[in-house]
Amino acid sequence: MISVFDMFKVGVGPSSSHTVGPMKAGKQFIDDLIEQGKFDSVATLHVDVYGSLSMTGHGHNTDIAIIMGLAGYLPHDVDIDLIPTFIEQVKQTKKLSIAQGKKTVNFDWDANMVFHNSFLSLHENGMTITALDAERNVLYRQTYYSIGGGFIVDEAHFGQEEENPVAVPYPYQYAEDILKHCQENGLMLSTVMMRNELALRDKKSVEAHLHNVWKTMKACIEHGVNTEGVLPGPLKVVRRAPSLYRLLQANSNRLANDPMHVIDWVNMFALAVNEENAAGGRVVTAPTNGACGIVPAVLSYYEKFVGPLTQDVIERYLLAAGMIGSLYKMNASISGAEVGCQGEVGVACSMAAAGLTEILGGTPVQVCIAAEIAMEHNLGLTCDPVGGQVQVPCIERNAIASVKAINASRMALRRTTNPRVTLDKVIETMYETGKDMNAKYRETSKGGLAVKVVCS
């Protein structure tokens, strides 16, 4: 079962597949060395990066993420402020402290961190880490694939089914299965998801995780609207959320007469989160970093304009959104490198639309209709980040998709006819569309806006 613990993970920006996943892979590699009793013999580490990870890796801080993972840190607990100093020290000394200081090994950044233009065979995001002893003998080598949303899998386990899956009361593979459970038992999506979660862990742990997810999202918005400046990288993108926030605060009475001013607030919420992500801040995968602004922006819309935002509302929103996200993870992809941005922003839009419909009192059928509408109108969305960075068009795209999610929810709630397209069919279509998409438009920065906009 794919849990809300899988779909919503606290991490660091700017990318779940290119930053969070590689950091986890680096940490896993070190843990494996220790478990195999080879750690003490390591003298040098070497990293090879392939495919989309390589082509947009510098802009996504993939190399930095791998190093921090080898250093013994994970995305949810790494000290963000420590990273620049640590990386500079590695580059200057050509030494890398691994496993949180347990050992120092040789690491020449230019020679031991190699970005290749080629792809590995199993997935678009591949990386191989090699440990060598003092005589340059290979002690251990492992290839990892970062398959989207911060999920990683090593070569030996790629494509394999989950070992010893936990039996849940309401198993599902498709939206059709979920709707059947809801109809037969008189349950909402969020209730079905919660009862499945309780097969994995106690209720207190689930509630604590969901509370921490929303707390982190809120903190991200707060930091985003109060942090001025220019985002890292050659694009020199100026943060827009703070100025928009000031405008909305200063003109609240006048703007209240504008029926569209709600959109300005939704835009601001999304911009704040994604600007924090682009700056390498603390964010929550929802389901990815590149699309991390949509789920919090839509719940913030509810809090400001619908409310009140109780703990029960937060939980039901995230449970329903997470359940819809799991359908895409199981039956399609949430990796921009695999299916384009429809797998990131498209999925996040679908998740947020479903979550909002759930807490607005929609039926399970309406929740799935909202999710379907949101994805249907993101089909074919390309992933063409300018300069290989998660800034243009990514930041603004989250704002647009947040508004689209709200609209999808409203359309689903007010629909009086049966839909012609089901959620399962749109998920199937999204995956096929992504696989048919030219690799130029799947997070390689080789086509689209990425080759039309000049970094200066």
Task: Show which residues each predicted segment covers.
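Structured, active/binding-site neighborhoods that engage oxygen-rich ligands
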Residues: 2-5, 20-23, 27-28, 36-102, ...
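Conserved phosphate/anionic-ligand binding catalytic regions in large, soluble enzymes, centered on
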Residues: 8-26, 279-298, 339-349
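Alpha-helical support elements that line or immediately flank enzyme active sites
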Residues: 17-34, 296-308, 353-361
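C-terminal regulatory domains involved in ligand/effector binding and gene-expression control
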Residues: 75-254
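Accessory "access/gating" subregions that flank catalytic or transport cores
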Residues: 203-340, 448-456
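Hydrophobic alpha-helical bundle architecture
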Residues: 309, 320, 326-399, 411-420
